[in-house]
Amino acid sequence: MYLMYTINENGDRVYTLKKRTEDGRPTLSAHPARFSPEDKYSRQRLTIKKRFGLLLTQKPEPIY
């Protein structure tokens, strides 16, 4: 089981262990992604994400 969260109507995080909320929306993982300082391909990964508009700064804010 992983700690998950959802954002309520006030914009606060509500933590849970469930994969979906009561109204069927998926919850988000509360754990950060794994990181390795020896990542050989980070430059290429960022280049591809920039090219296809997949960076979080290039996406609109999610509507909950």
From Swiss-Prot:
This is H/ACA ribonucleoprotein complex subunit 3. InterPro entries: H/ACA_rnp_Nop10 (IPR007264), H/ACA_rnp_Nop10_sf (IPR036756). It is found in: Nucleus, Nucleolus. GO terms for molecular function: snoRNA binding; telomerase RNA binding. Signal peptide: none annotated. Pfam families: Nop10p. Keywords: Nucleus, Ribonucleoprotein, Ribosome biogenesis, rRNA processing. Induction: Repressed during starvation. The lineage of its organism: Eukaryota, Metazoa, Ecdysozoa, Arthropoda, Hexapoda.
